[in-house]
Regions:
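P-loop/Walker-type NTP enzyme "switch/lid" segment
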Residues: 2-9, 13, 24-93, 144-150, ...
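Hydrophobic positions on the alpha1 helix immediately C-terminal to the Walker A/P-loop
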Residues: 18
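Structural beta-sheet core signal
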Residues: 35, 82, 104, 132-134
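Inter-motif core of Ras-like GTPase G domains
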Residues: 89-110
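G-domain G4 guanine-recognition motif of GTPases
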Residues: 107, 131-146, 166-177
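Conserved C-terminal guanine-recognition region of P-loop GTPase G domains, centered on the G4
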Residues: 113-132
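Beta-strand-loop-alpha "switch" segments that mediate conformational coupling across diverse proteins
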Residues: 152-182
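Inter-lobe coupling/hinge region of RecA-like P-loop helicase motors
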Residues: 175-198
Length: 226
């Protein structure tokens, strides 16, 4: 079983958004997923209610996710996506300890980029693989990323933080889909938003495969990233 945790001590970075879109992208009968909403704000739970279906299934966690994760493993769940609150509380630390990989969303601005440091330190302390995902980014122009995205990448290098090479652009389709209780691919499969979510998922899958291979070989898992 693979556990993907979305964590950042800053609010509004896109933890719930990415968790919802990726879960909707991945879930199917042959690849069952579970959502865990550990954020008291309940954004992921709201999205799930708007879906009008119990697929993927969702559980709420207040102080700990460990029991839910253990039960999911017994039930044969393949992927677990955990949304966490914007802090470094006990439930966030517990989620990181249970993670196969931690995704740290950050918008390409000085406040968001600076805020990733505490989450990075927690991942390193727990020896858990992690990667920063630039979310809510300005659209590329002629396939060239915005200068502010480039600056964000350069800043993250100073933290020795692995950063996904792509970006999730600030697109209306992402918000419209959530309002309908859908993921980007369900809302408009041929859209650019769906394509970016698909590329992010492909990167996560590759990383998890590398993490699993490294763990089998006794390698340093906390150095793996998307």
């Amino acid at each position: 079983m693979n556990v993907i945790v979305f964590a950042s001590r800053k609010g509004g970075t896109g933890k719930s958004t990415l968790a919802a879109h990726l879960a909707a992208h991945v879930h199917k009968a042959t690849k069952p997923c579970l959502l865990i909403d550990a954020d008291p704000q309940g954004s992921l739970t709201l999205w799930h209610k708007l879906r009008g279906t119990n697929e993927p299934a969702i559980k709420s966690a207040v102080n700990s996710v460990s029991g839910i994760v253990s039960a999911a493993k017994r039930d044969g769940i393949e992927w677990v996506f955990i949304d966490t609150p914007p802090n470094m509380s006990a439930v966030v630390e517990d989620a990181i300890r249970n993670a196969t990989m931690v995704i740290i969303p950050a918008r390409p601005g000085v406040f968001d980029v600076n805020a990733v440091q505490e989450t990075i330190l927690s991942c390193r302390a727990a020896r858990k693989p992690y990667a920063v995902v630039l979310n809510g980014a300005p659209a590329r122009r002629d396939e060239v990323e915005s200068p502010i995205v480039t600056i964000a990448r350069e800043s993250l290098v100073k933290f020795r933080a692995p950063v996904w090479g792509g970006q999730i652009t600030n697109r209306a389709d992402l918000l419209m889909a959530l309002g309908h209780g859908e993921g980007a691919r369900e809302y408009y499969a041929e859209g650019r938003a769906a394509a970016e979510i698909g590329r992010l998922w492909a990167a996560i899958e590759r990383s998890v495969k590398a993490i699993r291979g490294n763990a089998s070989a006794g390698g340093a898992m906390h150095k793996q990233a998307a």
